[in-house]
Design a protein with these regions (language model features):
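C-terminal ligand-sensing/allosteric alpha-helical core of TetR-family HTH transcriptional regulators
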Residues: 8-9, 50-53, 81
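A beta-strand edge to alpha-helix "cap/lid" segment located at domain peripheries
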Residues: 55-135
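Alpha-helix C-capping/helix-to-loop hinge sites
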Residues: 12-16, 36, 87
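Short acidic-aromatic low-complexity motifs
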Residues: 2-28
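Short amphipathic alpha-helical segments
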Residues: 1, 5, 46-49
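A solvent-exposed, acidic/Ser-Thr-rich amphipathic alpha-helical stretch
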Residues: 22-77
């Protein structure tokens, strides 16, 4: 079951990134889900929290964005997804970062989602400071 939920998550993320279909990904989360990442100390709770996280905190951060998955590991009630995300900031600046997302799954729903990545690097790219510091 966990492998199928992970696959549906990847498909829904693709639709969110490519077509801004927010409801597809929100529908995968449990009513009492917890959603977050290393950038935000705030945890987003429930489906409304998932909607805010995946809309305002994720998709709206980018102009264009696309994630690819290198490894997907799923076991009973858990999945780990290794990914790379590329796209542009809203001002057109290129963005690339990679990380790992952990999904805790109950039945056919995601109970908890947390993503781990280099938040400093992503922040510099989104604010256009990466080239100044890297160069």
């Amino acid at each position: 079951m966990s492998e199928q939920v992970a696959k549906r998550f990847i498909e829904a993320l693709d639709k969110l990134e490519g077509g801004r279909d927010l409801e597809g990904i929100v529908g995968l989360f449990a009513a009492d889900a917890e959603v977050g990442n290393v950038v935000s100390p705030e945890k987003f709770r429930g489906r409304e929290g998932a909607r805010e996280f995946w809309g305002a905190k994720y998709r709206d951060t980018f102009g264009e964005v696309r994630s690819t998955f290198r490894n997907v590991f799923a076991a009973e009630g858990r999945a780990a997804l290794e990914w790379a995300t590329e796209g542009t900031a809203n001002d057109g600046t290129p963005v690339r970062y990679d990380g790992v997302s952990i999904l805790e799954i109950e039945g056919e729903e995601i109970k908890r989602f947390h993503a781990y990545f280099d938040a400093g690097s992503l922040g510099r790219q989104l604010t256009g400071k990466a080239q100044a510091q890297d160069g």
